[in-house]
Every structure is written in C-alpha cells, then in structure tokens.
Amino acid sequence: LKKLTRFYHPKTIEEACQFLGNGEGRTAVIAGGTSAALRADSSLEALVDISHISELNYINKDAAFYRIGACTRVQDIYKSPDLKGPAGKLLQAAAGKIGSTLLRNAITAGGNLAGLFPWSDLPVAYMALDAEVVCRRGRPKRTVPVMSLIETRAPQFLAANEIIAEIIVPAYGPGTGTAFAKLAKTANDYAIISLAVRLTLKEGVVNQARIAVNAITAQPVRCLEAEKLLEGKALSEELIAEAANKATDSINIRKDIRASEEYRRE
C-alpha cells in the first residue's frame, strides 16, 4: 500500500459514501481489513473504515426475515441467540467454519461477500438461502439478489460511492432443512470445497432446492442441474446420490496447490 495517504473514519453511512465518491484517487472500503490485507492493492490511495458505523452492526428479525448489518462480525453471527430455525442454523454453521476465533472477530458479514475469495464460506450460505443485499449510496438504496452481486462481483457491481449495508435472509419455517459442509486440510485452513444446501418440502416432495458450492470454482456457484433433478420428487437415498453425482456436471472445477481438479470433483 505504498500510495496510501488518507484513512477516513466515517460515523454514518452518508459520510462513508461521501468519502468514497469524492473522486480523490483510488479508494476502497474496509471493515475487518482481512480482504484488503490479502489483496494488498498497491494502487490504493485512500481507505474508508466503516467498522465504527453503528447502523451497520446488528442482527434483527421481523416476521419473515433476518436482517444482518454489513459490519456485523462473523463471530457475532456464530454465537447469536437470535439466529434460529433453518436459516439461522445454516448461517451459524457457515460462520463457525470460518478460520479461527481471531479471524471471526475481524471478518464481517458484508466483507466476506464484498471481498469475495474462492474460499469464502458465508456467500454459499447466502446463495442457498436466496438472500438479498441492501446497497446504500447515502440515503438512496437498492435491494438486489445476492446472486447478482456475486456473479458480477462487488467492485464492478457497486457504484463508486456505494456500500453493502445489509443482508436480508428469509427465515423459512417448517418443511425447510439446511446443511453446510466444508472440507479443508485443517480446521483453520482455507476450504478445498464448501457446500451449502437448502431443501423446502411440501407434502413430502421437494418444492425448492438450492445447492451452492465454493472453492472448487473461482467464486460461489449454484449446482443448477442437481437442483432441477431434486425438485418435484420425493427424497430417497438413491435420488440424493444421483443429485450428488450430477452436482458438478456443469461446473468448471479449478485446481490449485491445495487440491487437483479430480480430487475436488470426487
């Protein structure tokens, strides 16, 4: 960060967006700082630290949704007594698999999405839950599907003076089940593969299936062929095995120093 000359500490969303949009060279947002540290972008001239904006740090629930502020720490998600039911279970399972306690106290709900890496764990949970993201430019805001932000990636999706403010997750109820799994060499290591699943059943038949994976690809993707196979059918061990085999059919699996393409596919 040799060109870094300015560091801003806004107290409100409006201030943060103003700093981002003032046109004073290359500027980036940080909250936990872990993504910025890994990328070490040498062209950055200014950082806007939004971690002290209280209106971005919360976990709330209304009748049908959980609302999570973008600066909520992953550790707070993992330990929150307010996250319950199928959605809460999946979010906490994913949060609990992120690194160590030290890292979970730095990484944020929005940062894990904005600073997207192949090993990021929360985004697959957001995708499986059909979450939405609230993006703010001061007072103006827009609500978009998390899939849209992930597919385009935050730096290209967000305007120069725009930040992720909130993640909205449907609470789901009876008839919905969720699961999260992560394979890594150690408990604190990056994922070789991470997987989030949500199945919503109606009268014993899969009404909606969501299967999202990461680490085997450059960014999280849904296993659309496996989802289609499950929907409209009654669950059985044979169907689940067939869906598992089909999950990676249409996915270009990557290789790296942690695992080969063949190992990840298996």
Named regions from a protein language model:
Residues L1-E266:
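C-terminal structural segment of proteins
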